[in-house]
Amino acid sequence: MNSKKTGVIILGCIAFLHIACSGDKKTQAQDTSDSMLEKSSAISEKPNIIFYLADDQDVYDYGCYGNEKVHTPAVDALAKDGILFTNAFTAQAICAPSRSQLFTGKYPLKNGCFANHTGTRSDIKSVTTHMKKLGYEVVLAGKSHVKPENVYQWDREWEPVPKQGVPRDYIPLDSIAAYLKNAKKPFCMFITSKYPHGKYFDVEHPKASDIKFYPFNENKKTDKTFIKTKAGYYRSIEEDNTQLEEVLKLVDTYLTDNTLFIYSADHGVSGKFTVKDIGLKVPFVARWPKVIKPGSTSNQLIHYTDVLPTFMEIAGGKFPEDMDGNSFLPLLQGKDVEVNNYVYGVRTNQNILNSEIFPSRMIRDKRYKYIRNFNSIEVVEQNLTGKPNVNYFIERGAKAHKNEPFEELYDLQNDPFEQHNLASNPDYKSIKEKLIKDMFSWMKAQGDILSENMIGIPIITPKGNRGFKLDQDTPRRKIPEARKNTLTKDDYIVIEHW
């Protein structure tokens, strides 16, 4: 395989300038064309592509990923009929930034959407541009949460629809059915569910034995509130599975075998807003009859930024060099080849309901993972400025995350749930130093606002009065009266395109 660039930012279609530190980007043209010829009977015509994206669901909460307590028969059946990926990632465990990667093939720092409720840069080309040029109709059916419209120009777009007796709107099944029945040209459709994202179902009298616990939440076994919330979440997962079942019935009724169907979820809920694997690792299952071997598994690192390059190659095109992602088409075709040697993660923690100043960056290969928390208690003093009002919010952010150290290093082979920090262990010094070097090289190539030797800590905001300001109350955090409205425009880095 001519793999494109090997570096990628951690981790449902798609999120880099040339990244020198991550390895050479290759074109994938010649070897992939050979593999395409091998599969010519299956993809001699452009296949239809459907990407189903759930909302806020842990990779650990599926039957096919080992949780026998949750009911996910439709996803489990897809895995049985296709391929299950064990190392698929998004770069940000939050809605808009995660989706922006799928749709652009670029990490959030490069595409501009690196905080929630913000927009992609207006000069970015998305899936709607790239796939249209390759002869596809590009459709969004369900939740969007991406902007601006000039970047995301869907050929057809249908909003979620209200449904009685359930906590969230449904995907637009009637519109999907009518479209699939009458489709005249190849299409790329994103079906974006609002499940299982809260508000969850109200489950009466749940028991701890109904829930599967993991090292990151086993201390909650006697927490009645947690158990009730988790039971409602499991029930919401079932409701999403019901919608997925209906979609698959429509696909099997109206479409040929020449249809690639991918299921994923935008990020985990247990690690939401973090760069831990419980937030960034995502479920990723694909079915493509006559191309994907049923019941197969891949342990290769793939990333949401790889989705658009893959779709473009399947459609007969070439993906541009400034995309961060690589095509994983060879994996779908049964070849065990490396797509990425790294994936990366971003944590902003500003412009959200619980806004605090606590940015993080992460780099991960198949075994080791390094995290830098730039405003930890350990280093907060060096982040302070000559402005008392700014310093209050810098210190507040560090205290809000007082249990998160400046550096984290994990051996994921022996510690998959990141319970034992090895950052200060001298036996891992060389591993840590290499990861640090490569992470900061990647950050520089991405145009990150953070750097290794920066002075202070950036405070970011959308222009004007929009967004969740650090010095104003939100529904989830209160600011002392004396600190309200004390920050000025000059205290912030204003992100103009937000």
Swiss-Prot record:
Its main location: periplasm. SUPFAM superfamilies: Alkaline phosphatase-like. Its cofactor is Ca(2+). The modification 3-oxoalanine (Cys) is found at C95. It comes from the Bacteria. Residues 1-22 form the signal peptide. The keyword Metal-binding applies. It is an enzyme of class 3 (hydrolase). Belongs to the sulfatase family. This is Ulvan-active sulfatase. It comes from Formosa agariphila (strain DSM 15362 / KCTC 12365 / LMG 23005 / KMM 3901 / M-2Alg 35-1). The lineage of its organism: Bacteria, Pseudomonadati, Bacteroidota, Flavobacteriia, Flavobacteriales.
